[in-house]
Design a protein with these regions (language model features):
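Loop/helix-junction capping segments adjacent to catalytic residues or to phosphate/diphosphate-binding pockets
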Residues: 52, 69, 101
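C-terminal "cap" of GNAT-fold acetyltransferases
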Residues: 90, 97-104, 110, 117-140
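Short, surface-exposed loop/turn segments at secondary-structure junctions
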Residues: 1-5
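Localized chelating/binding microdomains
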Residues: 21-22, 37, 44, 72, ...
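Conserved GNAT acetyl-CoA-binding A-motif
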Residues: 76, 83-95
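Conserved acetyl-CoA-binding loop-helix of GNAT-fold acetyltransferases
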Residues: 62, 68-83, 104-109
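Acetyl-CoA-dependent GNAT
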Residues: 6-65, 76-77, 138-140
Length: 140
């Protein structure tokens, strides 16, 4: 999971992004709200290439103050339910930092399988790296 704080965009950029997502057959956005504010969201995108239209990748972000409340689990279940009903989507994919053990455990609990790894893909500081683990789940 990525921190919501890392997703820096202007209000206008957010509005344009949400408009695009709500009018797309290849993209989905599900938002978790708590006490009138966005607590997190999950976004799915499927490529417009015909040979890859059966696949898609998602990213999930939960704000720090709303973690450990089951929102990630709820958002992931919502996305997978949507993907299972989608007429084209057969495979849902993600990338997760190897240091994010809690997220990896959640994805495995939902049936995601590791299919690859980008070694030292993410650099946190001087000589501090993490792999980017690629995972997928078949939904058909």
């Amino acid at each position: 999971m990525t921190a919501l704080e890392e997703f820096n965009k202007t209000i206008d950029q957010h509005e344009e992004w949400i408009k695009r997502l709500t009018n797309s057959e290849r993209e989905a956005l599900f938002v978790a709200e708590r006490d009138g504010e966005i607590a997190g969201f999950i976004m799915f995108q499927s490529p417009d290439r015909k040979r890859a239209a059966h696949t898609g990748t998602f990213g999930i972000m939960i704000s720090k103050e709303h973690r450990d409340q089951g929102l990630g689990k709820l958002l992931l279940k919502t996305l997978l339910d949507w993907a299972e009903k989608h007429p084209l989507i057969e495979k849902v994919s993600l990338a997760v930092f190897s240091t994010n053990e809690r997220a990896i455990a959640l994805y495995k609990k939902f049936g995601f399988i590791e299919e690859g790894r980008k070694v030292n893909e993410v650099k946190f500081g001087e000589n501090e790296y993490a792999d980017d683990i690629l995972m997928y789940k078949s939904v058909k």
